[in-house]
Amino acid sequence: MRHIISVTLQNEAGALTRVAGLFSTRGYNIESLSVAPTDDPSVSRLTLVTTGSDAVIHQISHQLLKLVDVVGVEDVTREEHFERELLLIKVRAKATQVGSLWSATQRAGGRVLWDAADSFTIELTSSEAEINRFIAEVANFGAVLEVVRCGALAIQKGKKVLES
């Protein structure tokens, strides 16, 4: 099963390496990883997506908490949460399809960052499923030249916060 794990850790050199090392030495795969400082510059928030049984994820969480830099760990998968990814996509549109490309971008809630003749760079923030749908849709309007996307970001709904 796919799991989203949020981790807060001290913003120290080597902290991310130790987290990634924990996964690699145990043979677990990280499907996506996003990390950035929080409102406290000494603490970073890491959001990672991995797969495994509930028992495996529970074990991973306990192992993460043993790392000296880790402050908090939460598997947000089964809790109510918001989850988003960011997509940047470059498309070469056929002249007859430019209007359709603009319409699809607006319907999806995206934004055209660059429009030059037949080349478009589009930004979209949405769920993984919506981003996958959008990529498939715009491929009908021309050639997809480049796709860049960040890993999943997640935050729990309501007042509950991850320890920092």
Regions found by a protein language model. Give the residues of each.
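Long, contiguous binding/interaction regions
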Residues: 1-4, 8-44, 49-164
